[in-house]
Amino acid sequence: SGKYDLYATYGQNKVSTEQGNGINPSYGADSPSHYDLGENIFAQLNTGLDYSRDFAIDGLASPLTVSTGALYRWEQYKQNAGDPIAYTRGPYFNPSTALGTGIPGINAGITDQDQRKISRDVYGIYLDLEADIVKDLNVGAAIRTEKYSDFGSTTNGKLFAKYDISPQLTLRGSVNTGYRAPSLA
């Protein structure tokens, strides 16, 4: 027996930036007052299968809970260029003034050179063991390994304990390693 959990989730965040009631001074009177500065899009798909089962073991105050699972995650980051007027220099560009096409990072549009589309795949598995070894003392151990298509593999472990001193007071502690892959952005 035991319990299975099969899941899949997808999410996307999209930020589009526009300039309204403004101009690119280097284009003078020919500058439109409204233009697209570009957009950033992050998408993620998470899928996995988890399994959990309790095993009665003599000498333990509770069943040993064994949880295991596998996951797949896809991540994508896209940066799309804005209208060329948002980042190009027009015929009235004057390098001796602060005017022109804007200061980089301040209302400057995303250029064709900045445009990108990157993604990665992540595969992982885990195993988690947990039980009350005596009344009011719960202990456990977990291990997880993940492989990133763009960054390599990592394996991390965790040891944890929880002691119920009284119904109002609980002492918890854990020791673990951790890892976070660099952002795609």
Question: Which role fits each region the language model picked out?
Answer:
Residues K3, K135-A141, G152-T154, D164-S166:
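Short, surface-exposed connector motifs at secondary-structure boundaries
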Residues S119, Y123, E146-N156, G178:
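Solvent-exposed loop/turn segments connecting transmembrane beta-strands
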